[in-house]
Amino acid sequence: MNILIDNRQDKVDAINLEELVEKVIKTVLEVEEVIDNVEVSVSFVDNEEIRKLNKYYRGIDKPTDVLSFPLAEFEDTYGEVEEIEEDSEEVQPIGDIVISLEKALEQSMEYGHSFEREVAYLTAHSMLHLLGYDHETEEERKIMREKEEEVMARLNIGR
């Protein structure tokens, strides 16, 4: 498994986040029983950079906490990635995650939990998007929330 992490901001201290993000990604893959010959790219950015990305890709001109860019195609069921070949030894990219550490810090203070907990949650949330989950409907939202909570519980990260 390859996890590529790029800190492209200097407004929030990112020390110790790499190990946390790697643990979250590995846990999501375990929960979803996805093989480990995958590659995920994670970029830490500030609010200005994520605002620009959000405007370009989603037409929303404001900062958001996390953006997910899946590279794999999915079958009709969650987490079953068609393009990942289980027998292949070649590492296969499944997508990119972009997290605004500035927004994560703001939200951690707003919600009254640690910054690390917020980054872990955003990573789990985004990984589930990379694996085909969404929250457009109430049913999808419920399923995704249960998966997020399972990942956070396995990591022993509470609110």
UniProtKB/Swiss-Prot annotation:
GO-annotated molecular function: metalloendopeptidase activity; RNA endonuclease activity; zinc ion binding
Cofactor: Zn(2+)
SUPFAM superfamilies in alphabetical order: Metalloproteases ('zincins'), catalytic domain
Keyword Transport: no
Main location: cytoplasm
Listed GO CC annotations: cytoplasm
Family under the similarity heading: Belongs to the endoribonuclease YbeY family.
Protein name listed in UniProt: Endoribonuclease YbeY
